Amino acid sequence: MKYTYHLTIPYQDVDASRRIRLYTLENYLLNVAGKTADQMGIGIPTLLPMNYTWIITHLNLEMLYLPKHNEEIIVETWIERNAHMLSVRDFRIYQSQQDGSQQLIGCAKTVWAVLDLTTREIVNIFDHEMFDGSVDGEVLNMARAARLRPIQLDNLEDDTEALQAGEV
């Protein structure tokens, strides 16, 4: 099932160019995900009595346009799949046009897990009844997020000799 939210960009959420700040847009998506989970009966108010909470493990966002102050965006969201203790939630972001149409300006993919607050371990609760019928199944075609390679710290002590005071 898909859920849709209409949001107007307030002045405090834009930067000096009057466009929405990227981290603010990401917060919008997280808030929409939380509201949707609450409406589906799988939100934090449902999970906390079981001593569980949602955590986000990945967020991949692609934008063609960053909306400006006072522009309306429409965020459409759905659960792509629940598998292997992870839930994949997708988003499409549209900009409202003056003629009433909507233009696709971005998309996002998030990956979530449920954390046991006592053991601090990720748990599989997707076989519970509360998750029946929550998956829409539509796959959002997005490029996979790049993986960052770990920084090699070998021979770090040797490299520090080249630094002078005040260079860092």
Provide a role label for each language-model segment.
Residues 1-168:
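Terminal targeting signals and extreme-terminal segments of soluble enzymes
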